[in-house]
Curated annotation (Swiss-Prot):
A Pfam family hit: Formyl_trans_C
Protein name: Methionyl-tRNA formyltransferase
Superkingdom assignment: Bacteria
Record carries keyword Protein biosynthesis: yes
Keywords assigned by UniProt, alphabetized: Protein biosynthesis, Transferase
Class of enzymatic activity (EC top level): transferase
Gene Ontology BP term (one): conversion of methionyl-tRNA to N-formyl-methionyl-tRNA
EC number from the UniProt entry: 2.1.2.9
UniProt cross-references to InterPro entries, sorted A to Z: Fmt, Formyl_trans_C, Formyl_trans_C_sf, Formyl_transf_N, Formyl_transf_N_sf, Formyl_transferase-like_C_sf, GART_AS, Met-tRNA-FMT_C
Family, as annotated: Belongs to the Fmt family.
Catalytic activity: L-methionyl-tRNA(fMet) + (6R)-10-formyltetrahydrofolate = N-formyl-L-methionyl-tRNA(fMet) + (6S)-5,6,7,8-tetrahydrofolate + H(+)
GO cellular component, one term: cytosol
Signal peptide, first to last residue: none
Length: 314
């Protein structure tokens, strides 16, 4: 039986681990990030992958730094024939990459060489792409730069969010891995080098990227809101207060107005001008310190005026 070590951390990777188990491989160990404090009460919480591994009685390693010798030697001691990684969250050292008979492969949520990095799902939507996909490739020390083994495309729908696309790609990744591993073991795959001239990056989202830039086009603002839903959530400011924007709709604007200005207030939301003739009607939001709510609920208690400017004093 093929011995496999799986390395992964978030929800996205749980179906991948589950599929390895279902396909009959001997998963001899799981490597994931350490438990972290979560929520206001800072409750120490295991990663989703650790929870799944423990359901199946699989040994779990949680190195703080996988590149340290005493940590990676614990992985090598498991003597895997194959290592599968998916959103593990640390750079894996060569000592691990070169050890398994069948190599170390990674399940990445983009059509490489596009969108290397830790947030490819967010960027695919924020950049307005109509398709993305899954790439399975050999791992190298350089970020997401290994030779490609297999790929599958996934359509991005008009109202897609990072949350919905996350679920689709998670299942697509598990399915593609299930088809890829047997071909890899049988030596039936021809690795393809990535075209370095076509490389783009999707680095982890920073706080300053979450703020809506109303000077962009309506389409770009709409994509920004979708791409940060349901985490970390786009935000703007209204009357100097931070407001998270969970959802908005593209609407035509007939009268020119300064970007970021409220140009209409309707029953289900208020329309904000952008840099072109497409505005964004905010329909779901979350004022600072309050729960997520529909804009119609918000407007029952707060009455912004037409001409109010959003995005100031952030």
């Amino acid at each position: 039986m093929i011995k496999v070590v799986f390395m992964g951390t978030p929800d996205f990777t749980v179906p991948v681990l589950r599929r390895l188990i279902e396909d009959g491989y001997e998963v001899v160990g799981v490597v994931t990030q350490p438990d972290r404090p979560v929520g206001r009460k800072k409750v120490l919480t295991p990663t989703p992958v650790k929870v799944e591994a423990e359901k199946h009685g699989i040994p779990v390693l949680q190195p703080l730094k996988i590149r340290e010798k005493d940590e990676y030697e614990k992985v090598l001691a498991l003597e895997p024939d194959l290592i599968v990684t998916a959103a593990f969250g640390q750079i894996v050292p060569n000592e691990i990459l070169e050890a398994p008979k069948y190599g170390c492969i990674n399940v990445h949520a983009s059509l490489l060489p596009e969108l290397r990095g830790g947030a490819p799902i967010h960027y695919a939507i924020m950049e307005g792409k109509e398709k993305t996909g899954i790439t399975i490739m050999y791992m190298v020390e350089k970020l997401d730069a290994g030779d490609i083994l297999t790929q599958v495309e996934v359509e991005i729908e008009e109202r897609e969010t990072t949350g919905s696309l996350f679920d689709k790609l998670s299942e697509a990744g598990a399915h593609l891995l299930s088809k890829t591993v047997p071909l890899l073991i049988q030596g039936k795959l021809e690795p393809i080098k990535q075209n370095e001239e076509e490389v783009t990056f999707a680095y982890n989202i920073k706080r300053e990227q979450e703020k809506i830039d109303w000077t962009k086009t309506g389409e770009e603002v709409y994509n920004h809101i979708r791409g940060l839903n349901p985490w970390p959530v786009a935000y703007t400011t209204l009357a100097g207060q931070v407001v998270k924007v969970w959802w908005g709709e593209k609407v035509p604007i007939t009268e020119p107005a300064e970007a970021g200005t409220i140009v209409a207030i309707e029953e289900d939301g208020f329309v904000v001008a952008t840099s072109n003739e497409t505005g964004v009607k905010i329909t779901e939001l979350q004022p600072s310190g309050k729960k997520r709510m529909s804009c119609s609920q918000f407007l029952r208690g707060t009455k912004p005026e037409i001409g109010t400017k959003l995005g100031e004093n952030a």
